[in-house]
């Protein structure tokens, strides 16, 4: 349970962030199970990549769970760590990485045959579902570099929320001042 000294507005923000991470993580686990069920051949490398995806989505669920309880402070710190691997995604000479546990707003620069045109492209991608892509030595030689603006914003948001909650906690514990509601 979130402590009573936290203002209603900040409790709501903690709860929304917590549920966002839980729902995104659960959706990611379900998508990963679905992809796994469609995979015809599973080598040790593919199994390792699936384990990595499950671990990342499970971590998102864990962060969300912490935010909904008394360990919200640890949940905020871990939530920042959860957002970091969601910032940058890339594809380059057969190697690719992309991960997001929820929505994404990405600025993307791409070049190659896998793009809309075969030249240099710049675009904005919006996604509402969790996504992961890990490629090792694939035949796709296109180039793509994306930055997830939502992940960057969430890191900023979480950091500001953490500062505000720390201020409320200090006011409550040391000065005995009740927070503004």
Predicted regions: what they are:
Residues 1-181:
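Topology signature of small-to-medium multi-pass alpha-helical membrane proteins
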């Amino acid at each position: 349970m979130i402590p009573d000294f936290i203002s209603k507005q900040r409790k709501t923000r903690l709860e929304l962030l917590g549920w966002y991470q839980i729902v995104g993580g659960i959706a990611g686990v379900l998508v990963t199970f679905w992809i796994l069920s469609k995979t015809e051949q599973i080598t040790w490398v593919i199994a390792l990549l699936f384990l990595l995806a499950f671990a990342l989505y499970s971590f998102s669920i864990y962060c969300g769970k912490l935010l909904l309880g008394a360990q919200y402070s640890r949940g905020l710190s871990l939530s920042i760590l959860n957002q970091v691997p969601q910032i940058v995604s890339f594809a380059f000479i057969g190697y690719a990485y992309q991960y997001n546990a929820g929505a994404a707003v990405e600025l993307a620069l791409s070049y190659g045959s896998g793009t809309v045109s075969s030249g240099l492209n710049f675009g904005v991608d919006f996604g509402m579902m969790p996504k992961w892509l890990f490629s090792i030595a694939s035949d796709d030689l296109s180039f793509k570099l994306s930055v997830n603006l939502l992940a960057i914003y969430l890191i900023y948001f979480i950091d500001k929320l953490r500062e505000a909650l720390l201020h409320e906690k200090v006011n409550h514990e040391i000065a005995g001042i009740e927070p503004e509601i």
